[in-house]
């Protein structure tokens, strides 16, 4: 059973480091879809079925970084970060609410199909 959790800013680095180490191994076949949604931009796909190599938070730049097989993507100034966590700790979805009100949606699958 999954659980939706709000991740406190002071826990972001540790939370996503633990997730990345446990589930995003070099041979992991998992894939991510990334989309930015905002009133000024509408819904804009950033990545589709791209291999997710890691998730990291940098407190100095205040950015949550997605390390993707196609290149890195950063969500700056996250006001809120939510994660859908499966019973084994796998994060299947991340929602980042930025200071400007836009949202970054990341859906992560364990299966094959990543590019």
Where do the model's predicted regions map?
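Short beta-rich binding modules
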Residues: 4, 38, 58-63, 98
């Amino acid at each position: 059973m999954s659980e939706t959790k709000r991740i406190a800013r002071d826990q972001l680095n540790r939370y996503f480091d633990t997730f990345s180490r446990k589930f995003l191994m070099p041979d992991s076949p998992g894939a991510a879809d990334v989309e930015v949604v905002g009133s000024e931009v509408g819904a804009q796909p950033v990545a589709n079925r791209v291999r997710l190599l890691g998730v990291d938070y940098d407190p100095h730049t205040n950015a949550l970084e997605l390390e993707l097989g196609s290149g890195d993507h950063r969500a700056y100034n996250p006001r809120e970060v939510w994660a859908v966590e499966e019973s084994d700790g796998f994060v299947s979805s991340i929602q980042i609410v930025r200071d400007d009100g836009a949202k970054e949606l990341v859906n992560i699958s364990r299966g094959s199909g990543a590019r």
